[in-house]
A protein has these predicted regions:
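Hydrophobic alpha-helical transmembrane segments of multi-pass integral membrane proteins
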Residues: 1-192
């Protein structure tokens, strides 16, 4: 029997690049950030680096793995899964690069918070908001109403990111936002 491979499969192999699927830049970024974040954390703890994070190293470390790392993994997954769930094309090329750049800008801005100031917080929070809005648009256009619950969880995670920043800047009791974020991450895993 002869196997027929759809033409678009050949095309995707031919143009297999970092920006052809959302999972590629974000999962690579998450993996590299996990290693770099740990290296920066260890360097700071041993006195070999002095990050200008603007708040305590423990808070920065917790934030970067709850929102930086998870934000990249969640974004990469949703950009890929949305195509299967909605039947619509996902972001590729320059729009995908811009979204990945937003994630990377958040990591850099928070590491140099003392230089960037409160703008760093807006840059950081923007990724989850943009991903939630993009995903909501895809769901509405595909009339895939069941997955609106994922949008609600992403928006709740973005809200916990805002609350985290609010706490570490000493406007609220510390720790609640981090626990909320962890609970929301578990909820996302269960729903997805």
């Amino acid at each position: 029997a002869r196997v027929t491979v759809p033409q678009n499969t050949h095309d995707s192999w031919r143009r297999a690049s970092l920006l052809s699927h959302g999972i590629r830049p974000f999962f690579l970024g998450a993996a590299l950030w996990a290693m770099a974040g740990m290296a920066l954390w260890i360097a700071a703890l041993t006195g070999h680096a002095r990050p200008a994070v603007g708040y305590g190293l423990l808070a920065w470390h917790a934030h970067e793995f709850l929102f930086g790392y998870v934000g990249a993994v969640l974004s990469g997954f949703l950009l890929t899964a949305a195509t299967n769930w909605t039947g619509r094309a996902s972001l590729t090329g320059a729009p995908l690069l811009a979204l990945f750049g937003l994630w990377l800008a958040g990591r850099i801005a928070l590491y140099f918070y003392a230089s960037v100031g409160p703008y760093a917080l807006g840059i950081d929070v923007a990724l989850l908001l943009v991903v939630a809005l993009w995903f909501a648009r895809e769901i509405v256009l595909a009339r895939d109403w069941l997955n609106l619950r994922v949008v609600a969880l992403i928006l709740a995670l973005a809200s916990s990111n805002i609350a985290f920043h609010h706490e570490v800047l000493r406007y609220a009791a510390p720790g609640i936002a981090a626990r909320l974020a962890l609970a929301l991450i578990v909820a996302l895993i269960m729903v997805i």
